[in-house]
Amino acid sequence: MKKTDVKKLAAAAMLVAAAVVGSMFSIPVGASKCSPVQHLVNIIGGVYLGPWYSLGMAFSASLIRNLLGLGSPLAFPGSMCGAFLSGFMYHTVGKKLCSMSFARSRNLGSAVRLPLAYAGELFGTSVIGGMLSYPVAAFIMGKEAALFTYVFPFFVSSLGGTLAAVVIVTAMKRIKFFDTVLGSETVENK
């Protein structure tokens, strides 16, 4: 295992721990327990570690939260969809947009990519995760709900975490926090 892999795994583990501890501050909405800190961690992981690490972090945090009684099974579809889409939008879509001559000539970089990560988290968690929560609620939890029941509560929770991420990720980029912690091997610099 390479040294950078160990550093990335350690960073992911710290972010999972932050999500679990942060879930003690949750907003109960129906059968779900919305945790804005999870969405903040999803964006940080998606931006600095990539979509696959972020997806694994969201799964791990959701599993631990459920085992400790701090979350519900609805944590899985919401957090995992938002985490993956945040990283995917930042790294794949954002990189393609930044490689276009229009964006290159204006040196847009993070000005384009970060809003894509935020939008990915919001859309992935609220719309996709909210709709995927329907079968989880109906078949696993025994709660009858309409298909779009969880979209708005998930959006509100995700919006809180995303607004916090706007402030925190911008500050982390300014001081090059993860470049210092992980070295130059962050997904960002590849």
Locations of the language-model features?
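Loop-helix junctions at membrane interfaces
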Residues: 1-190
